[in-house]
Amino acid sequence: MLERAQRTLKRKVHYSGVGIHFGKSATLTLEPAEENTGIVFYRSDLLGDRIPALLPHVCNTGRSTTLSSGDSVIATVEHLMAALRSSNIDNVIVRCGEEEIPIGDGSSHVFMQLIDEAGICTQNDTVPIAKLARPVYYQTQDTFLAAFPCDELKISYTLHYPQSPTIGTQYRSFVITEESFRKEIAPCRTFALYNELCFLMDRGLIRGGCLENAVVFKDDGIISLGQLRFPDEPVRHKILDLIGDLSLVGRPFVAHIVAVGSGHSSNIALGRKILEELQP
């Protein structure tokens, strides 16, 4: 059975910023936690319930991933969760003073900086690294995801945006390690199509969106502060989102994930199927 030592943070760290969808400023605090705590969210502005970062607590997947417990809700957790998962951090208390995690620059970069500032502490207890008993898949319309037994965590993603010549069809495949995530995936920002913006605003979303935290694709060009960080930054960001969503399985696992056009809803659906087939 594969296993490794559990890990937490060495010290408490803070970050203040705005949420991309609700546009509210909030302070985020990451705190060390005891062994076998898991990743747990608290709303520091409420005397509410603890919100474990687990699939049963997912309550909304519209343009981001939202968790809830009782009356407590915390939105847009995926970029933070991707950073924690890829850094092999098992136990941490996350406190947020609003209903949405601050977006930073739209990537996982700020959360990797927080983890570096806090430092990582190895704990005494171990955690098993689970494997898939058999392949699983999820499909709906033009979206397809599958997970195959593998001895490492690998993600292969195909993104197809025929409505955007600048994005077009992109494909990337990475073995996910702390190093590969930090260098190849964490800097990649969230993005939207220009013709989606009115629709999103009409739904009360992206109130905190701006060119400091997102890339907008318009016709055959981009609207951004500076150039793309990678020529295929959109597909890399989709891999970032997928890592964050699948971290809600709540257990370290290895598999080869193949995804075509997936989003938060389908990522979570695959996560539930993976959880059913993990061993031990």
From Swiss-Prot:
HAMAP family (alphabetical): LpxC
Gene behind the chain: lpxC
Top enzyme category: hydrolase
Xref: NCBIfam families: lpxC
Cofactor entry: Zn(2+)
Entry function: Catalyzes the hydrolysis of UDP-3-O-myristoyl-N-acetylglucosamine to form UDP-3-O-myristoylglucosamine and acetate, the committed step in lipid A biosynthesis.
Binding site residues for Zn(2+): H79, H237, D241
Name recorded for this polypeptide: UDP-3-O-acyl-N-acetylglucosamine deacetylase
Keyword Hydrolase part of the UniProt annotation: yes
Metabolic or biological pathway, per its Swiss-Prot or TrEMBL entry: Glycolipid biosynthesis; lipid IV(A) biosynthesis; lipid IV(A) from (3R)-3-hydroxytetradecanoyl-[acyl-carrier-protein] and UDP-N-acetyl-alpha-D-glucosamine: step 2/6
Keyword match Chaperone: no
EC number from the UniProt entry: 3.5.1.108
Source organism: Chlamydia felis (strain Fe/C-56) (Chlamydophila felis)
Keywords: Hydrolase, Lipid A biosynthesis, Lipid biosynthesis, Lipid metabolism, Metal-binding, Zinc
Top-level taxon: Bacteria
